[in-house]
Amino acid sequence: MKKKVTSTDIAHAAGVSQSTVSMILNKKYDVSFAKETVEKVENAAKELGYVPPKRKTRKGTKREKLLVVFCPNLTNPYYVMLLQGIEAHAKEKGFGLFVCNTQRDLRMEERYLKMMWQLRPLGIIYTCNPSHCFMDLVGEIAEQIPVAIVNNQNEKMNVDAVELDNSKLGRVMAKHLLELGHRKVAYIAPPLTARQKQRSKRVEGFLKEYEKAGLRDQVIIKAAKEEIDLDVAHIDSEYKIGYELTKELLNETTDVTAIVGLNDMIAFGVMDALYEAKIKVPADVSVMGCDNTLFARMHNMNLTTIEHFVTFKGRDACDIIMKKIASHHSANMETAPISTYHVEYEPHFRNLLR
């Protein structure tokens, strides 16, 4: 019978102490080691065929019915709406929620992810794609804890997803503007970086429709600089993007007939900048957002926005986790995942433009 590999064996092979091996293998999030040390220990464990022991629970005790939800911020009502959908369904099933607000801070996201090994929730939901540099880590966690992602997931990740077709949303927005005769338009967006591919997909979908109409050169794209995603001190950053970039746009041109915000929060900033410039909405310039958030429904808002049933997507993500818990397997086991979940809700407009 093959001898069971212990942390002491790994320590000898890696040339480090047994306590170092224990902390690295147990993913102690409050202790940091040199990257070389971590790699040495992980490689030694892999080569020796180390199998981590199953966690022991006290007799008669039950694992807490807990789900963890990762959010990039809680100032955009879109994420609050997703949370409401998740929490409503979780509550029906007797689960509690632990919300990790990463504020788009890579260090915070990494810290929360490493906490998962100790917290051991019954499921994890990402309300947007994990940051690119942590996709492998999320995949590793998904081997032991059910994970679901809301948004266009990375094709390299074998993790269940509720698909949000950002490209389609962009196309729908563009078609509506074209049908209304808007030829010269502007699109205001947050940073369009590799880290936030879903944003780029929405913009690309919009541009494709204008290109098909032979009007690609009539679309002005104004995207914020990447630094704004790091400026977590300002909780109203998306509103500021809309406001500041619209002021910049008005200094450059005055002949656009419509301005699109990537989401409602940006569109609110657009509207305030236009109001300050004494430009009437929608009489002079039409404004469009996306997500149909609470503020967009207020009586004095002349904002056209797209309803794509955000709360339902939250429920769907929670439903994936419940099904996976019930079937006692996670995404990367031999049994197929519940699905790469795709529920298509046909987007429709609210407060139509003129």
What are these regions, as identified by a protein language model?
Residues K2-T6, A45-Y78, L82, K93, ...:
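N-terminal helix-turn-helix/winged-helix DNA-binding helices
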Residues S17-S22, A34:
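Short coil turns linking two alpha-helices in DNA-binding domains
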Residues T20-M23, K59-L74, K184-L192:
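Short beta-strand segments enriched in small/hydrophobic residues
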Residues K91-N101, L207-Y239:
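Short beta-strand elements in bilobed, periplasmic/extracellular small-molecule ligand-binding domains
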Residues T127-V172, I188-L192, M265, D291-L303:
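Flexible loop/hinge segments that line or gate small-molecule binding clefts
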Residues D160-I188, E204, K208, Y239-E248, ...:
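Hydrophobic alpha-helical segments within soluble ligand-binding/sensing domains
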Residues M173-R216, E334-L352:
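An alpha-beta-alpha
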Residues Y243, K247-R354:
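Flexible loop/turn connectors
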